Amino acid sequence: TRQRAKTELGSRTVDQVIAALVKWTKALNRADPNFEHQRLEALWLHQVMNVANEPLLNEILASTEPRARAAAVRVHCYWRDRVNQPLDTLAKLVKDPHPRVRLEAIRSLSFFNTSKAADIALESVELPQDQYLKYALDETMRTLERFK
């Protein structure tokens, strides 16, 4: 069960967990219908262990599964100070074809202390917006207005 897994992982060192996790992740079968979810679980465990794995993050950000991409954008936000060119990545993600991915990217931009983040967020209006995207954009712009 999940609780037993959490207990077991908690009894191990970070190095032990990450070594086993990397091995497990490499052995995942791309043909498995749960492949994207399993990679997300690996990404989330890296996050719990406070070990950024930018290559895995970037792979999931490029996934064909929009829910996986959206979840990875949330992790990207938490790791924004630990990944390369986070604003460049978010500039691509605010134009993602899936609205949930765009919403997460817009929300993520609110955590940056720069006017460039506001400029990137505004690029999202080039694609259709629902009430949730509009709300996220309004809140992000309100947060970033002090950096203009």
Question: Model-found features: residue ranges?
Answer:
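Alpha-helical segment of the N-proximal tetratricopeptide repeat
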Residues: 1-14
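Alpha-solenoid HEAT/ARM repeat scaffold
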Residues: 2-3, 37-40, 70-71, 88, ...
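Hydrophobic core positions within HEAT/HEAT-like alpha-solenoid repeats
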Residues: 6, 22, 40-43, 58, ...
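Amphipathic alpha-helical scaffolding segments comprising HEAT/armadillo-like alpha-solenoid repeats
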Residues: 14-29, 50-62, 81-94, 114-125, ...
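Alpha-helix N-cap/helix-start positions at coil->helix boundaries
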Residues: 33-36, 66-67, 84, 97-100, ...
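Extended, hydrophobic alpha-helical segments in both membrane/secreted and soluble proteins
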Residues: 68-79, 86, 90, 99-108, ...
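Boundary/linker segments of alpha-helical solenoid repeat arrays
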Residues: 129-137
